[in-house]
């Protein structure tokens, strides 16, 4: 039942997306963007007024779906739909399915992304300080909160896939319609981007680097192609609420393109609203902000050329295409001659990666392990777009290399999850996804895609819920000994649990009704 509710919610957001429609042509990327924005806006508004209840979420979605239908119905399609992105559709499922069919396993997702979302749902409000990171810019976690409120924690991996799909379809659309890339080249470019390891590994997590990259790319797209479109306002505002550096990237985009004052106002108001929220709660809530080296020491640039060399080595090993896309962004002002603003925005994003905190190390090595490559996601995304024009000159060779890169990226993900036999079905399911896209286009059966998507959500949620205890217990196993704490929580379902040095997200998955609280570092037992 929970899988069905998750499918209804996610497909419902897709159906309600035209409520935000602002252009005559409304492709897959546009619908994905607006669906994700609605998925953030519903819990954001309800949570601000202490109404974050399942019934309120469903009522809001129903009203928006009706509005979307009324706005969309009178419009006559200007063409027979978009050409299916066969490579992109298959690649998305190939890298995401091994993660979708499992409960959340990513460390950051379980440490603070999910605990934030769960705490809001449990409090029915955004006005809480039960977690260390309650102050964190909330956009992607709000999307997770909506799904957590109405459905199942085992459906949460789909939150990451939506952002990854938006990035892929926007790169394909931008390359094809605006930059003149041949259809297969545009498809292959998008597929190679979303299968690059730093991005693909977030395809079914609650991490927000791909979210930031996707919405920053959307902001750049509309600033570059239709600077008066109202979609810019929403994209810039949402970007400002993604990670602490979201507003910096928004400012880079708006500054390089000399955006209109209303766009600046929207991004500033969104951030100001959340800062006001934090200011009002700051006195009563502890906050975990940073641990490890100082700000400057945590950056890559502080460690000079050896650190930059390490970045090049680690990125090349993880994904050659990711390195190529990043370098394209870094040299954007030289590569992009027709839209100088786009080139400078890309270059600034690449430079920001080297000077932002956590790029080199925190309490643990970030760069040497490749963990910090995810912070370069915005630069990689726009760098992929910048590669479209040069790739046109050698279209056949470029397409072949991009397909090879796509297969390499899929192989990296498969290698990570291969020991679990269920991973082996990911490739056949990816082929089915491409087949569904082809059938829907050939027979003009547009209803086929949401039905297939709903079926996939139900199936993946069921598979993820089969034996979560095995995954989580193994994470604490020492030799042949495994503690029984997670099994006790799953069976006893206590009313509340205070945690210190533990990933509260595991408890949020195993016992959604259990209220979880991050205990302070000092006097934890007394506080509990």
Residue locations for each model-derived region?
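Membrane-embedded, hydrophobic transmembrane alpha-helices
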Residues: 1-78, 387, 392, 396-432
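Hydrophobic, aromatic-rich transmembrane alpha-helices
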Residues: 13-19, 164-175, 313-351, 383-390, ...
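Transmembrane-helix motifs of polytopic, lipid-linked glycan transferases
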Residues: 15-18, 41, 65-71, 146, ...
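Membrane-interface alpha helices of multi-pass inner-membrane proteins
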Residues: 42-47, 190, 229-244, 250-255
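Perimembrane helix-loop-helix junctions
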Residues: 71-76, 225, 249-270, 336
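Transmembrane alpha-helical segments
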Residues: 95-96, 246, 402-442, 448-476
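Membrane-lumen/periplasm interface segments of specific transmembrane helices
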Residues: 101-102, 260-329
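Short periplasmic/luminal acceptor-recognition loop of GT-C membrane glycosyltransferases, typified by
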Residues: 461-524
């Amino acid at each position: 039942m929970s899988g069905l509710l998750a499918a209804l919610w996610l497909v419902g957001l897709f159906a309600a997306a035209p409520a935000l429609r602002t252009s005559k042509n409304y492709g897959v990327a546009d619908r994905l963007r607006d669906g994700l924005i609605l998925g953030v806006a519903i819990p954001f508004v309800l949570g601000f007024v202490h109404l974050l209840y399942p019934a309120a979420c469903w009522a809001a979605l129903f009203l928006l779906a009706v509005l979307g239908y009324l706005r969309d119905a009178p419009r006559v399609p200007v063409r027979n739909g978009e050409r299916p992105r066969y490579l992109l559709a298959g690649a998305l499922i190939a890298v995401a399915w091994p993660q979708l069919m499992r409960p959340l396993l990513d460390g950051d997702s379980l440490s603070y992304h999910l605990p934030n979302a769960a705490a809001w749902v449990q409090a029915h409000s955004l006005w809480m300080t039960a977690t260390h990171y309650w102050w964190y810019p909330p956009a992607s976690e709000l999307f997770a909160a909506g799904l957590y409120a109405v459905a199942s924690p085992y459906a949460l991996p789909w939150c990451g896939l939506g952002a990854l799909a938006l990035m892929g379809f926007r790169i394909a659309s931008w390359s094809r319609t605006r930059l003149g890339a041949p259809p297969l080249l545009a498809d292959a470019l998008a597929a190679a981007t979303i299968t690059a390891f730093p991005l693909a590994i977030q395809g079914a997590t609650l991490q927000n680097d791909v979210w930031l990259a996707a919405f920053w790319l959307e902001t750049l797209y509309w600033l570059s192609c239709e600077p008066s479109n109202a979609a810019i306002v929403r994209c810039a505002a949402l970007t400002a609420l993604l990670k602490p550096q979201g507003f910096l990237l928004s400012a880079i985009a708006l500054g390089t393109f000399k955006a209109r004052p209303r766009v600046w106002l929207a991004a500033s108001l969104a951030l100001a609203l959340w800062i006001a929220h934090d200011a009002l709660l700051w006195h009563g809530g502890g906050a975990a902000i940073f641990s490890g080296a100082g700000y400057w020491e945590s950056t890559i640039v502080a460690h000079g050329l050896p650190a930059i060399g390490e970045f090049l080595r680690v990125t090349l090993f993880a994904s050659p295409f990711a390195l190529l896309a990043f370098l394209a962004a870094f040299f954007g002002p030289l590569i992009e001659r027709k839209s100088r603003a786009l080139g400078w925005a890309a270059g600034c994003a690449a430079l920001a990666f080297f000077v932002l905190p956590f790029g080199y190390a925190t309490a643990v090595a970030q760069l040497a392990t490749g963990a910090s490559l995810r912070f370069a996601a915005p630069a990689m995304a726009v760098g992929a777009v910048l590669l479209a024009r040069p790739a046109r000159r050698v279209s056949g060779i470029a397409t072949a290399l991009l397909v090879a890169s796509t297969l390499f990226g899929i192989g990296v993900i498969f290698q990570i999850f291969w020991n679990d036999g269920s991973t082996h079905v990911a490739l056949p399911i990816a082929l089915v996804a491409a087949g569904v896209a082809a059938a829907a286009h050939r027979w003009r059966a547009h209803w086929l895609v949401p039905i297939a998507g709903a079926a996939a959500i139900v199936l993946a949620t069921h598979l993820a819920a089969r034996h979560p205890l095995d995954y989580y217990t193994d994470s604490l196993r020492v030799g042949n000994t495994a503690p029984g704490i997670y099994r006790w929580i799953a069976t006893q379902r206590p009313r509340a649990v205070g945690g210190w040095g533990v990933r509260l997200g595991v408890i949020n998955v195993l016992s959604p009704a259990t209220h979880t609280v991050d205990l302070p570092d000092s006097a934890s037992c007394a506080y509990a």
